[in-house]
């Protein structure tokens, strides 16, 4: 979450009259994240999250995101729920941006997750994959294998500002992944961004998943690889196999991975590491000065990518083969 667009209090109060949300008591911007402008609202009824959708988010995708939250919530997954306007629509407009009010989810994200938390995340991810079955809308993953080369080309000329010699390495990686990317694996709705700051806990109990604005249709095991990258590396760059084992056991307690998915995990993990390196690189080079947004280091994911290149067997992630 982040703030790119400021809002005037009078405009916000007028916006709230279109909802059964009570009267505004206070609001503040939320700096974490990189995609949309987000605000925490306290009203005379319930706390809410106000999201203004910025230019990177296609307005045509919003029915998918908001409808998915409704679909998952109706099937028992703990996640935020869009608040409908008085006219029944889920989407309004504020400060020249499409805007929505979303229910506030109790909990906090973990700064230092442990293996027991990784197990809960794995289980919740699998529950989401199962609950997503039957969702009628479709959204291709624009940030998967077919989109990476174009994304790299946007940053390639300046990549040397981050680390010298990146051009040859990333070009070679793109060539490898284009040839090795698996097909025919189980697919469905994936979260595609289930980082620690998108999972809330109350104590050690997972209380819900948030931020579905990268959700799309893709390989389910690719979503697993994103979580391994996001949750199972330590700050020094080392892969924590205890966390990896816990996450994979948690996932498979709900939805066992097929042999083909397990075999593909090293390639998928290289791909998901490259995906986040590329988007972080682009944001690092292009985020405007003064934006209330937390930029994230692209080199963290370059190091993870290099780790995955050395993997000889999926067992090295913590799988029992």
UniProtKB/Swiss-Prot annotation:
Example of a GO MF term: ATP binding
EC number: 2.7.1.39
EC category name: transferase
InterPro entries linked to this entry: Aminoglycoside_PTrfase (IPR002575), Homoserine_kinase_II (IPR005280), Kinase-like_dom_sf (IPR011009), Pseudomonas-type_ThrB (IPR050249)
Domain of life assignment: Bacteria
Catalytic activity: L-homoserine + ATP = O-phospho-L-homoserine + ADP + H(+)
Pathway(s) this gene product operates in, as recorded in its UniProt entry: Amino-acid biosynthesis; L-threonine biosynthesis; L-threonine from L-aspartate: step 4/5
Alphabetic keyword roster: Amino-acid biosynthesis, ATP-binding, Kinase, Nucleotide-binding, Threonine biosynthesis, Transferase
GO BP annotations, alphabetical order: threonine biosynthetic process
Recorded family membership: Belongs to the pseudomonas-type ThrB family.
Entry protein name: Homoserine kinase
Species for this entry: Rhizobium johnstonii (strain DSM 114642 / LMG 32736 / 3841)
């Amino acid at each position: 979450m982040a703030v790119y667009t400021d809002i005037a209090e009078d405009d916000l109060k007028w916006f709230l009259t279109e909802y059964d949300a009570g009267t505004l008591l206070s609001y503040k911007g939320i700096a974490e994240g990189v995609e949309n402008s987000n605000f925490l609202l306290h009203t005379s009824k319930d706390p809410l999250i106000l999201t203004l959708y910025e230019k990177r988010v296609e307005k045509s995708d919003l029915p998918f995101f908001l409808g998915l939250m409704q679909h998952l919530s109706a099937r028992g997954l703990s996640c935020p729920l869009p608040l409908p306007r008085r006219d029944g629509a889920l989407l309004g407009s504020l400060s020249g941006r499409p805007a929505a009010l979303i229910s506030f989810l109790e909990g906090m994200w973990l700064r230092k997750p442990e293996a027991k938390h990784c197990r809960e995340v794995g289980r919740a991810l699998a529950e989401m994959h199962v609950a997503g079955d039957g969702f009628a809308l479709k959204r291709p993953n624009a940030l998967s294998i077919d989109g990476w080369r174009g994304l790299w080309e946007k940053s390639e000329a300046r990549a040397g500002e981050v680390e010298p010699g990146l051009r040859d390495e990333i070009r070679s990686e793109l060539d490898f992944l284009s040839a090795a990317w698996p097909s025919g694996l189980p697919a469905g709705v994936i979260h595609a961004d289930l980082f620690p700051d998108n999972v809330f806990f109350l104590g050690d109990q997972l209380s819900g998943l948030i931020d579905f604005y990268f959700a799309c249709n893709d390989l389910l095991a690719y979503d697993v690889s994103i979580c391994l990258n996001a949750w199972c590396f330590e700050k020094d760059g080392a892969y924590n196999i205890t966390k990896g084992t816990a996450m994979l056991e948690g996932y498979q307690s709900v939805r066992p991975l097929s042999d083909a998915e397990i075999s593909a995990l090293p390639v998928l993990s290289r791909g998901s590491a490259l995906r986040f390196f590329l988007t972080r690189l682009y944001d690092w080079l292009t985020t405007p000065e003064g934006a209330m947004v937390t930029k994230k280091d692209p080199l963290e994911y370059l190091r993870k990518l290099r780790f995955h290149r050395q993997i000889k067997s999926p067992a090295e992630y913590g799988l029992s083969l």
